[in-house]
C-alpha cells in the first residue's frame, strides 16, 4: 500500500498546504512520539534541528507540542546540518531525531526528515506505522498531565557536531596553506561550515552565510553552482565547496573553475579508498548516476550497483551488500565508515585530505569522461500521468531507438510535483530525438 504522508525523503511540501502546517506538525509529533515511546528506555528523548526557513519558527513549536504531549522530552538544537542531527541522535542516545527542512527546495517549502536511535533514516515499515498513528483519534496518544515531556535548548549543537567530525581526522590534520571558498546556501551549514574549515587553518572565503528566512538556496548553494565557480576564480582558491539548504549535499569546483558533481566526487573518493585499501565491497549509485561512472568502475574492477533515487535507498543497498561508499549525482554522498547519511562537510574533509598534500583539485577529480546527459524536469499537477498508456508507449519507443547506444529514464519526483526525463548517449542527435518523443507526450 502506498504511503500517505512520507515521500522518498521524509515529508515535504508547500508551507501551510495540506501536510505542512501547524496542525499536521502537531500530529506528526504526537504520532512519532507515541511510536518511539514503545522503546524501552529510561528517558524518552527526541532532538529537533532545522534549517533556516522562516516557516521553521511556526512549525517547530507545533512539532514540539506534539512530542511533549506524547510524553517525549525534547532538545531543540536550532540550525544544524542534517547529518549533525543524525550524529547527535546517536551520541545523545535519543529515541529519535527530527530535521525540519525541505533540503534544496526554495524557502516556501518545508518538511521533515526522521532518524531512529541508530542515526539511520526510518524504514518504509516504520513510516507506515507512524502514518497509522497520525490518522488515529488524538485521545489515544495523549499523555497524562504529570507525564508530559519537557523542552530544553541545546546551544552547543554545532560545536558538538564539529567535534565529532574532527574526531575522525588524524591528530596532525590541518588545512594550512589552502584557500577554500564555501557556499552554505544561506542554510543549515552557515555556522558549522566556515567554523570547521577555519579551525583547521584554512583561508576561508564564505558566501551564503547570511540567512534571512527567505533566501535559503536562492541563487546560491549546490543547485546554483555558478556562484561557487565564479568565487573560486575571483579569490584564486584551491577548491570550492557548495552545500544545499540542509548541508547533506555537496557540489565542488576545482581551481580552474570547473564544477564537479556528485558522480565525479564519488569516483575520486572510490579510487583513493581503493588505493588505501579502505573501499569495502564496491559503490552504490542510483538510477540517475551517469553511465560514464558505471563504465569507469567496470574498467577499474570496482563493483557498482544502482538503487532507487534517494540517499535512504542508497544507504539501504550499501547495508544490504556491505558496501561503505555510495551516493547520488546531485551530491548526496554517504561515507559509510563515518556516517549514516549524506554530509557535505564530511565529504569535503575527505577530498581535502588529498589537497593538503599538494595535489590539485583538477588532478584529484580527473577520473572519467561523463556520457552526455540531458535532464528535463517538467512541472505537473498530477505525477500519476506517468502511468498514462500514451506516455508509457512513448517511453518504450524511445528506449527501443536508443538501445545499445544509451539509455532513457522517466520517473516522478518523490519530493516535488515534477516528472524527470533523463537521457544519456554519446549520440546527441539520437538522444534529442528520443527525448522529444517522450516529452511531447508529457507536456
From Swiss-Prot:
Keywords, comma-separated and alphabetical: Isomerase, Magnesium, Metal-binding, Phosphoprotein
The protein's Enzyme Commission number: 5.4.2.10
Residues modified as Phosphoserine: 103
Cofactor: Mg(2+)
The name this protein goes by in its record: Phosphoglucosamine mutase
Active site per the UniProt annotation: 103 (phosphoserine intermediate)
Organism: Pelagibacter ubique (strain HTCC1062)
Enzyme class: isomerase
Positions of Mg(2+) binding: 103, 244, 246, 248
Note accompanying the cofactor annotation: Binds 1 Mg(2+) ion per subunit.
Reactions mediated catalytically: alpha-D-glucosamine 1-phosphate = D-glucosamine 6-phosphate
GO biological process: carbohydrate metabolic process; peptidoglycan biosynthetic process; UDP-N-acetylglucosamine biosynthetic process
MF GO annotations: magnesium ion binding; phosphoglucosamine mutase activity; phosphomannomutase activity
Protein family per UniProt: Belongs to the phosphohexose mutase family.
PTM remark: Activated by phosphorylation.
InterPro entries named among the record's database cross-references: A-D-PHexomutase_a/b/a-I (IPR005844), A-D-PHexomutase_a/b/a-I/II/III (IPR016055), A-D-PHexomutase_a/b/a-II (IPR005845), A-D-PHexomutase_a/b/a-III (IPR005846), A-D-PHexomutase_C (IPR005843), A-D-PHexomutase_C_sf (IPR036900), A-D-PHexomutase_CS (IPR016066), Alpha-D-phosphohexomutase_SF (IPR005841)
Cellular compartments per GO CC: cytosol
Entry function: Catalyzes the conversion of glucosamine-6-phosphate to glucosamine-1-phosphate.
Keyword Isomerase: yes
